[in-house]
Amino acid sequence: MNQTDLKHKLSAPFDFNEWKNILAQMFPKIDYLAKETSVDNNLVKNGGQIGVIHLNDGRSLGLFKFEVADNIHISRNRKGLREIAAKYVDQDIINGALVLYYSGIQTEYRLTFVSKQTVFDSEGNLSIKETAPKRYTFLLGESEPCTTAANRLIELINKNKRGSVYLDDVTEAFSVERLNKDFFNGYKTQYKRFVDTLTNTKQHRDYVKKLLGRLVFLQFLQKKGWMGVPASSTKWENGDKNYFAKLVEKYLDNNRLLSDVLEPLFFGVLNTKPEEREALFIKKGWNISLLTEFEGIPYLNGGLFEPDNIDNLTIDFPYSYFKELMDFFAIYNFTIDENDPEDSEVGIDPEMLGHIFENLLEDNKDKGAFYTPKEIVQYMCRQSVIQYLKTHEPSEQYAEAIEQLINDGIVNPILQNKNIAIRFTRLLKEVKVCDPAIGSGAFPMGILYVLYHAIHHLHSHAEPHGNFNSTQTKRDIIQNNIFGVDIEQGAVDIARLRFWLALVVDAEEPQPLPNLDYKITCGNSLLSRYPIDAPIENVFVEYNKGKKENEKMTLAKYKELVSAVSYTHLTLPTILRV
C-alpha cells in the first residue's frame, strides 16, 4: 500500500474491515478479543475494547472502537468524545490506546491516539504516578483532506516493514507540534513569494501579512460551513467547505483576482451588513453580479476585514500565487476548536493565527513578542484562577478542592453542596482578568477555557435541574471577565478573531456577538493619563474640561454606552431570510 492508496482509503466512509487491513500493515502484532467489550452509555450505540496492539519495544496499546450516538457530531463534538474516552479508555490502559469513533449517519470519523505513560523519578526508577491521558486525533472521511494522516500513517507502515514500530513512533505520527512546524514553514514560503513580487518595504510586508492572515482566517470559517451557504437555506448550514479553492478556480488565470474578486469580498461583504452591500459595490465600482455569488456569506464584526490605509495601495498578484496558496491550504485540516495540551486534533487550529502573527512580527524580540508554549500558558492560567479562588475562599478546607476543580476537572464532595457550588460559580463569573500585553490572545484564551470548564463542572451541582448553555457561557465570560490591551493593532485583531471563533465553534448559526471594542483595545499599557491611585470617578476630569454639562462624561454614562454596543448582530443575507 502506498501513500496515495492509503489517502484514498482514509477519505472513504468508515469501514472496519478496511481498517483491520490498515492496522495489520501499521503494527507488528494485534490480538483481537474473542468477545468485544460493550458499554452502556447514552453517548455510545455500541463498542468498547476490541483488541491489543503489540509494539516492537515491548509496549502495547489498547484498541477500541465506538459507534457514537446520533446526537454526537463527530467533526466538532470533542467534548462528547472526551467523555467516552475518560470513562471507557483512560482508566484501562498503561501505555496508550488507539480509538476509532464513527457514526452510521455521518461522513466523518476519528482516529484518536491516547497517550498515557508512567513517570520515572530523578534516579530513573519507575514511579507509580502516571501522566494524565493526552489525546491526539485525525479527522477522517469523505469531506476531509486526509493528506497529513496518510503521510503520517504510511510512515508507521514503512517502519513496520523494517520491524521497528515503537511507542515513540506512534507518538510522532500524531504530533501536532510537527504539523504546526510544517505548516508554518510552508506558509513562510508562500509569504515570501508574495512579498518578493513587491518592493519588500515594511509597508508592503505588512500588506502581505494582512492579506494572507485574512485568507487563513477564512479557511476556518469555511470549515464551519458558513461560506457559500445555498440561497435556498433558511439556516447557516450546508456551506461549501472547499469554497475558496472553487472560487479561485472559477476565475482561472485572472491576474486581477485580488482587485476584482477578493477585495469586494473582504470589504464589501465580510465587512458590510447585507442591506448596505449593494450601495457600497456601486460606490466602489465593483462588479455588482458578485453580490449574487457572495449571498451565502455572513457579515463579520471583526477588525481583520476593515479597510485601512494599507489597503489603499493598488496591488495585484499573479493568479498562480493564489492557486498555489489554495493548494497549500488544501493539504491541511483546519479545525475551529482550539486545541488543548491534553486533547489535540492533528490539524491547524485558530492558535495558528497568533503563531503566524508573532513569528512574522518584525523586531519581535525588541518588542518583547515571543511565542509561549500552550502548556505554559495553561499552567499560568490555572494557577492564576486557583490563587484567585483561594484568596476569596481562604479556608484550608477548600484548598485541595479548588486545585482538583481547576487542574483536573474534579468536583470534590465539599463543592457538590448546592450553596457552595453556587458560591464558587459566582466567584468564577465575577473575576476580572486583564492582560496588559495581550499579543494574539494566548493568555486570555487560556483564561476563557479555564473559567468555562470550571463553571461547566460546577453547573450540575449549582443548578441541578438547569441546562448548560455552552455558547452563552463562553459569551458571558468574554463579555464580562476578560480585558486586554496591546500596542499592535494586528495583535488586537487576531485576539478578537480567536474569541469570535471560540463562540462559533458550538453555534448552529451566527448569534449576537460581543462587541469587543471596549474589551480588547489597542494602546500602550506602559503609559497612563491617570495616577495609579486616582479614584475611578476622576478618570473623565480631563475629558470633561470645556464641555457643556450635557456633554460631560460620567462613569455611569460610560457604562451605559458600553452596554448599548455590547452586542452586534450577525444577520443572514436577505435572500436567506424566511
Model-derived regions: residue spans:
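Short, exposed interaction patches on small structured surface elements
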Residues: 525-567
